[in-house]
């Protein structure tokens, strides 16, 4: 359900609500083996129930000539949220293994260095916001767009501890230039340090990432 209203000639607002149910995936139910990409030995749970969530959001859009912007705020209240939770005591002792740990003649466990993790579920709440504003202007025979955006998400379980593997807040600075069939884009992501970590996790450091892209569109139909 979504309701919208114009607040002025340049600003409109919309309010949305959604009730969503998600069944556990096959992996979440029956996984029982290594996931080498994440360095984990994952165990599913056939007793998992469906996730249900009530999602609320409010969005403001602004457009006035060359200038534009939007801001969106949301709260998602999730019952029986499914997540992969590391076994706490399994983070210790994975480094420093050597051959002396194994009796003579006993084969190595190929999964001994993987962190054991289980699919579990618990009530959780997510909240956050996304904002972006920018300006599009004529430059030479094309259009130049400059923008800034930021997104933030917070997630906690009902007992107060943090949901694991949540993306840190980030700022995104973007520049794009379009002229005829050529588009050049440049963006710099300034990602914050993540201190709101789940059980068994370690903080991730802040970092910056610069992306560039140049594209040209060709008409293969032969029509002018």
Predicted regions located by residue number:
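Outer-membrane beta-barrel transmembrane strands
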Residues: 6, 49-68, 122-127
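Hydrophobic, lipid-facing positions within transmembrane beta-strands of outer-membrane proteins
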Residues: 1, 13, 44-46, 54-58, ...
């Amino acid at each position: 359900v979504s309701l919208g209203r114009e607040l002025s000639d340049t600003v409109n607002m919309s309010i949305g609500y959604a009730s969503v149910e998600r069944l556990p995936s096959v992996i979440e139910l029956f996984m029982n083996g290594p996931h080498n990409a994440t360095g984990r030995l994952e165990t599913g749970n056939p007793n998992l129930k469906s996730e249900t969530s009530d999602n609320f959001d409010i969005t403001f859009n602004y457009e006035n000539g060359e200038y534009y912007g939007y801001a969106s705020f949301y709260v998602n209240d999730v019952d029986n949220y499914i997540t992969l939770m590391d076994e706490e005591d399994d983070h210790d002792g994975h480094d420093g293994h050597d051959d002396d740990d194994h009796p003579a003649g006993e084969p190595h466990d190929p999964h001994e260095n993987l962190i054991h993790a289980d699919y579990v579920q618990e009530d959780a709440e997510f909240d956050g916001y996304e904002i972006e504003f920018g300006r599009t202007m004529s430059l030479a025979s094309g259009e130049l767009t400059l923008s800034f955006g930021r997104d933030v998400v917070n997630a906690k379980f009902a007992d107060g501890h943090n949901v694991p593997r949540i993306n840190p807040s980030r700022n995104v600075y973007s520049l794009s230039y379009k002229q005829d069939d050529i588009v050049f884009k440049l963006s710099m992501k300034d990602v914050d340090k993540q201190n709101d970590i789940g059980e068994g996790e370690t903080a991730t450091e802040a970092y910056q990432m610069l992306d560039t892209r140049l594209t040209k569109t060709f008409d293969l139909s032969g029509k002018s």
